[in-house]
Amino acid sequence: MPVAPFAAEFDQVFKARERECLEYYHSCAPPLSLEDALIYRSAASGLLWCKKFYRWVVIRWLSGDPNHPAPPVERLKTDNAYWRRLYADDVISMPDSWEYPYFCQWDLMFHSVAFAPIDPATAKAQSMLLRSPRYTAPNAQTPAYEWALSDPNPPIGAWAALRVFQIERHDRGSGDLPYLRAAMRKLILEYGWWANRNDRSGDNVFEGGFLGLDNIGVFDRRYPLSDGSVIEQCDGTAWMAMLSLNLLEIAVILSAEEPEYKDLAERFVYDFAQLASTLNTDAVINETAKVMRSYRNWDEQDGFYYDVIKRQDGSWDYLRSRSISGLIPLLAVASFDVDTVQRVESLDVNSILRPYLAERICPNWISQHFGRWNNDRTLFSLVPESHLRRILEYVFDEDEFLSPNGVRSLSKVYEENPYTFCEGEETGTLAYSPADSPVAMFGGNSNWRGPVWMPFNFLLIESLQKFGRYYGDTFKIEFPTRSGNWISLWDASLELEKRLVGLFRRGEDGRRPFNGAVELFQNDPHWKDLLLFNEYFHGDNGSGVGASHQTGWTAIVLKMLTQLQRYNSM
């Protein structure tokens, strides 16, 4: 072997490639400090590194290879057997190319949005991939992940398509309307699957299923309890409401050039109204004028949205655990300016839809969700203003959800006082656990019982900004709660972004919170500037937990850096 395996010009070539890399990221990112530019570049490069080739032909997996032993017959009895036409043969952005080397449906949507500023073409391709004919089931369901293709995941595909379009339009001067039209066609099919499959009782309650939050419930929310009771998940209905508004926003954009999309926009207004009624009123009336429910997910006593346990005899109870499951309703919000409302008549709820809605839904709350104007905008919100203030008092309370590095997934009040609920012969307990999972549910390698998760925080930040755009300075909240520091919802969103970006920034002590007590990573000159993007973060001190290379959805922090710079709030 030669003494010098590389040619003399190797260093020059390597430095040239390094310079080109820096120039490319400089062209994508706003002007940032050296510290923040490192975070941005590390997040983006990790996102690129987690793209892997993935091949899985389900029919071959079921039937086996010629001239080889047949696979276990049990495969034919699994839910995955329904997906026999799934044919994966693509480069896919993995959640973590080491620990999670496979596609995950809702993770991939966050990856797409994170890709949008640095590679719009990849962002669009990844956001559409799982909705292509090679992946979707005959009933239009989108696959979840390889071990349980049929699991329902949070339906954020419309949000991802909308944000990818908007980011490219902002950064490049024009949005890709053909992409948005193609996305809409596929999303409409998936929307039909959600509406027809999960609303089993006909009362707009979406219950059962994974829904992305793993072990967040006091019971495993995927299954009925042993006595036949079922859990009506407030976040399931809220995710569906968010999907309705995302599709409404897409339809409104497309209707500017193709007026036929106005009919779709009207449909989503109706659907959103029904979903808002489900979470917020004491009774839901279906199309046959039959009262389906005598309760709501909003608990006026506590000022929070809770899951409801519904028994076979018709009785019910709240599962009074304060988790981000009860914060998901905050994500279903949109507002439109005067010109847009004049162009798309169905957005003018007061003059067009109020008679229809008043007959089919409870008229006394319509004005709380529709038709209100402020800052020359009209608001569509699953959470009315009176509920919003009460929920945010919990969100921004440092004894509840607000941590030094973002919003926790479970209230800290359950650290010393765990929540326990007994139902028949089953007893469930939920305790605040800020780091690793305390239970084996879902394998025990993720934990939604206290840690800070970047994807939910990002969605919450965007929702606060939507509320802030509508309310302006007419709605202020204490940040933190009981601090006497009253700020607008827009400013509150930026304060959250600072806390989340702070996970990766060096503090005054020279330490990065995500590295925790690992002195090698904190201080060694060879390691201290090599950033990892963990799956989730300790709910008290911000140290990284879970998969350590999950640059996928944690890379969304680069969008936060962009916003903080754009609004001069570094």
Give the ranges of each region predicted by the language model.
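Acidic, mature catalytic/reactive cores of soluble proteins
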Residues: 1-570
